[in-house]
Structure formats: C-alpha cells, structure tokens
C-alpha cells in the first residue's frame, strides 16, 4: 500500500512533510511531490493548489507516476453543519460536488454526465482507520464521518450554505 496525501495549500501539508522520512522529491505541473515514509507507511505528500481541477490533476499524477493505492485529501474546509465547531474533524463517508449542475441536459444537480452516481463513496476500511486514529490523537475534538461537499467557490452567503447543507 502506498498513500498519496493531497493538501491544496502549503500549511495543510507542511506538518506531514516535517514528520516524513523523505526519500525523494519530484516536480510536475508546478507541484512538488515528496515521497517517503510517514512512520512505516509509504506516502507521497503534495500541495496541489486550490480547486477541483488541480486536485484531479494531482491525483492522476499520483496514480500514474507513483502508483499510489489510496488517496487522502486533507486540509481546511468550510463549516456548514451547525453541530460542528472550528477544529472538529470530518472523515468523508462520501463526496458530492455542490457546484456541478447540468440540469438542462436532464441530469440531477451534482451528477456528472456519463456517470451513474451522484456521490463518490469513500473506502470503508480507510474511514474506520481514520476515525480511530483521529479520536486517539485528538480526543478533545469531535470526530465524525459524513458527506463532504466540494465546490470551486468560497461559500460566503447563508443562503448558499443552507442550500448545500
């Protein structure tokens, strides 16, 4: 197993890089891929840049160049669930795109043309490992598993936040 860990911004991956035993660095598409070990686990950590296109390109490079078996996206996110506080941890059970809408082509909001799914399910074993690990290292925080909504915009209005949630 080799895990690719993506963060959009440098502060989201800096601590991971500091904790790694680095074997090599590699640059492609203006991204620096840092390969090595985190504990005893082979990982590749990378700052992708903000946005779903950057994350998708980064993921493909991780698969093609580094043969990662799993991809984890880590970082800061907006807060829509009123039961959560800043700093709480959400492990995704599935992912939806809140800004994908091709309704005029007879697709449901969030559905990508050509795909039969509305949401992308996370790996059950990774969810369980992440929940256990997060609760061990941050017992003072609320740790939950739930749906994550992604979009290429900052949600700054309560109306949009309510619509997404």
Predicted regions, residues:
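Glycine-rich phosphate- or other oxyanion-binding loops that anchor nucleotides, phosphorylated ligands
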Residues: 2, 26-165
